[in-house]
Amino acid sequence: MTEQLPKGYSPHLYNQDLGPQPQKWTWYNIFAFWMSDVHSVGGYVFAASLFALGLASWQVLIALLAGICIVQLIANLVAKPSQQAAVPYPVICRLAFGVFGANIPAVIRGLIAVAWYGIQTYLASSALIIVVLRFFPQMAVYAEPHFAGLSYLGWLGFLSLWVLQAAVFWAGMESIRRFIDWAGPVVYAVMFVLAGWIVWKAGWANISFTLSEKSLSGWQAFGQVIVATALVVSYFSGPTLNFGDFSRYCRSMRDVRRGNFWGLPVNFLAFSLVTVVIVSGTLPVFGEMLHDPIATVSRIDNSMAVLLGAFAFVTATIGINIVANFVSPAFDFANVAPSKISWRAGGMIAAVASIFITPWNLFNNPLMIHYTLDILAAFIGPLFGILLVDFYLIKKQKIDVDALFDDSPSGRYYFDGGVNWTAVKALLPATLVGVAITFTPALQGMANFAWFTGCFLGGLFFLVLARREQVRAPAPSVAG
């Protein structure tokens, strides 16, 4: 990959995809980004699950609002350095971890994204097969597991979605922006129509905003509200960590904050309310409560409605997979060897890897997920803490953009051999605490708060170590 290097930039740190980009995105593009992230089969199931915790509807709404407002605050904080420097998440990681040490947080996030990319694609393809069998029941013979644990029909569905997602990604960030700009509203339109149909069939009197037979009260209810709040924050932690991959394109932080407001508290609350109306109504309409939107659509006695509904939710899955699990590893893997791996090549590495991990086997083995994804996820909280403390408290919101691409020993972010060992020292113990919480039965009560624990400890350890070791901060003269 040959391209003109700006003066002083190292080919080991720079390619055009990682360098500063034109900033043309408006608040609506950020709003659409969050719509694509929220409007998915996974988001639908997650939103419905919050109303099945045994809480009164107003208690669930309090938890929803509290959790999503925390996410909004974090997203605003994470967005600023990337918007300020117009560079993606792995490049911003060089501030805290060093120009080469940044590969540690980048690869961690990339591996998590690869696994979830495969799982999301598999889940969407499985739901799509339900629709296919609705129209072609004779194909059920091809739905039995055959090769590598997946059926012929399963492979057809998985690879079809895989190719569709790869095609959208390959077209570039501008095409991705255009795709997510309309994908979110399309899903909303289908959901509103579906909710209206459900209410018409079930009757408003049969719609309940509580999806659980149990009912909590007193301190039990209060504790569950806190748990629900933590679950919301944890659910959004992945895409929020690499939100800079998108905020880098935004015209201003004012646009980012406005887009985050409409895309997070307003959008998530509206989506959750429509979701619970649909899920609640499936019981009187179909005789059982359905938590999968495509399964719900497939039960409608209208072929055109089934096709439109399936199209909308497949579109939603493509949207979330691209914004949360495709763009991220593309930048992350390109950051490892910029002169050899372009953004497109990084994305295709992730896409191909998602096949070889056979996500259907991973998803169907909860113990395997527990020992792989949960360990990787234990890194996310500490990474938030370290990156935010470094930018806001250590570096005082100052970034020397040119130094982010300088691998000379005198470079501002070169530290020790290109690695800031202070950040690594802070990351490891904070992560070990998260792993201990996840895998120690006696600490299971804290498992839902692992993100908060990791974020606090990662930030605290880094702050103490950085001040003790007097890590250099950029001078006031650099861009801020």
Language-model segments: residues:
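Membrane-interface "cap" regions at the ends of multi-pass membrane proteins
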Residues: 1-57, 72, 191-201, 216-229, ...
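C-terminal membrane-solvent junction of multi-pass transporters and transport-like membrane proteins
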Residues: 17, 21, 383-464, 468, ...
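Hydrophobic, membrane-embedded alpha-helices of multi-pass small-molecule transporters
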Residues: 27-44, 157-164, 195-202, 213-278, ...
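Selective recognition of specific alpha-helical transmembrane segments in multi-pass small-molecule
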Residues: 42, 66-74, 108-120, 185-200, ...
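Juxtamembrane transmembrane-helix boundary signature
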Residues: 63-97, 109-112, 116-122, 278-282, ...
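Membrane-interface loop-to-helix entry segments
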Residues: 108, 119-125, 156-198, 211, ...
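Hydrophobic alpha-helical segments and their helix-loop junctions in multi-pass secondary transporters
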Residues: 121, 125-134, 186-213, 235-236, ...
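Transmembrane alpha-helical segments of multi-pass small-molecule transport proteins
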Residues: 133-170, 185-194, 225-243, 266, ...
